[in-house]
Amino acid sequence: KLKKQILAKALLIGEDFRFGNNREFGINDLLKSNIEIFILKEVRKNNKRVSSTHIRKALSSGDLNLAKSLLGRDYCISGKVVHGDQRGREIGFPTANIHMFHNRPPIKGVFAVKLNEEFGVANLGTRPTVTGISKLHLEVHVLNFSKDLYGQHVHITFLKKIRDEVKFES
């Protein structure tokens, strides 16, 4: 059943891997699922264990350098460019609105980014200036760029946090 739910033939997991509600399932449960399992040994960086929890904390605090050190690469999000409400375009700063495949990224704010290979500025958050919106949005203004990206799958690399989101009065 699990193999059908997660659509995986193999999983790469850590020695202390747990999953499910309240982390109730472990490696032995996976072994029963006929999914090939590869177990990684613990990785340490600066005498501290590297874990997804540690990485998420670094990201949520805006420490992209620590996250990069732990991941071995810059933090990235992929998604598809979709039509937005054109507000950025109306004020001279068109944005690529990204439908994120991961709907709860551990990172929020305004960032210097690369969209594929082009530099830009991204806002990832709830857009507090736009009233009545609580869903997370990722939108990127690509510098000196005018190509049509609608429908394309893009890769956003987070380079530096500029600031938290701010609600503007006008």
Regions found by a protein language model. Give the residues of each.
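Phosphate/ribose-recognition catalytic cores of enzymes acting on nucleotide-derived substrates
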Residues: 84-170
